[in-house]
């Protein structure tokens, strides 16, 4: 009987130690391209941003890139959190080249179409205001409900850096 109790206790102890094993979270398929970004929007007219820097006078604001619900490596979401044009659109992406685009993508925030071209993420591609290297993002956008095209600009250029956590970079 003593051996049976000892065996039961040993089995219970072994099971309790096994249940303490923590399983880390898995990475999403677009983890290298996903993030929080501080961007500025410039107008582009004839390939130049001259005189069209920070076109709307907003300075830098936050956008997000993240995986879709399907969590496949060839698509991700670009979302401005309502900070600028109120858009959330699914784009096609190439995680190896870190590029992305969409033509007439459905805006999930309200009924409109969004075209994003020449989207790219460059690892350590820029310096933040604090002097730290950070990933750089750049893409061009045309909204189908933008009344200022083509009178004032051809498209909008979003560019900026990945969130670093440093106060001086916010």
What is the role of each PLM region?
Residues 21-23:
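Bacterial signal peptide processing site
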């Amino acid at each position: 009987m003593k051996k049976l109790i000892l065996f039961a206790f040993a089995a219970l102890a072994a099971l309790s130690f096994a249940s303490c094993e923590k399983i880390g979270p898995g990475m999403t398929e677009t983890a290298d391209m996903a993030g929080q970004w501080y961007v500025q929007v410039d107008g582009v007219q004839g390939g130049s941003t001259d005189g069209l820097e920070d076109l709307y006078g907003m300075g830098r604001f936050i956008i997000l890139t993240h995986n879709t619900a399907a969590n496949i490596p060839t698509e991700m979401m670009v979302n401005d959190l309502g900070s600028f044009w109120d858009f959330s659109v699914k784009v096609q992406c190439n995680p190896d080249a870190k590029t992305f685009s969409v033509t007439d993508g459905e805006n999930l925030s309200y009924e409109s179409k969004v075209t994003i071209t020449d989207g790219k993420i460059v690892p350590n591609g820029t310096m933040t205001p604090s002097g730290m290297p950070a990933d750089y993002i750049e893409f061009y956008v045309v909204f189908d409900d933008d009344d200022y095209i083509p009178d004032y600009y051809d498209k909008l250029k979003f560019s900026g850096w990945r969130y670093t956590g440093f106060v001086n970079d916010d």
